[in-house]
Amino acid sequence: MAQPASPEERSGLTKLLWFGIIQIVGMVVGWISVFSIFGLQFSNFPGLSRLPRNATQAQVSAALGPFFQNFSLIIPVDIAVGLVAAVVLTMGLRDMSKVDGPKFSVPWKLMLLLMIGSALAGVSGYLIFNALPAIIAQAPTTSRTPSSAFFSAIGSLLLAGLVAAIGGLLALIGLIGGEILGLWRVGAKYDETLLKLGAIFVIIPLLNITAPFLVLIGAYQVKGRLERPM
């Protein structure tokens, strides 16, 4: 008869279940927020429709400002949900490393890079969206020299972009070496195809929408098998 699951295995798989649930909830909240903001801005927001035919940059900036500010609110929410999911997955992979250290010690540590990189990219993205209206308003026309405020805003934007790029690189390393590799190895350890598919789909556009569902179902099936050893 197969060995019963250890407490660490049960704990790790339970955290994988919660990882999938949190990602699904975050995805739903994110889509609702995006559609709500676009609907409010372009259907009910009067600023854009009231712009004169030859609107100045300041007028365009004032009209688009609320859109950029509202859209920037999605970033902290998305990053916060993503970080919570990453923390849960990190704890789950760390539990699994107590059962099989060679397979899971590296992925759970690389998950830390994913969290750090996501936080850096999220903060930078928030600053970029908030700075865009001011840059539009201060952008020079053909008849005047750029102001010092414009150069200052551009400098801040470039710095935020650099930090976002660094954060994105760290997040990518963590995503591949931490989340994808970790989920794949859990699927390989327990011969669960859905977990391995979920790991692959994480990085594929459009298919990544299905990844949390595959991880959730796969972890549930593995946990069920371990709790009822044959």
Task: Describe the function of each predicted region.
Residues 161-172:
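Extracellular-loop-to-transmembrane junctions of the mid-late helices
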Residues 1-155, 171-230:
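Membrane-interface extramembranous regions at the lipid-water interface
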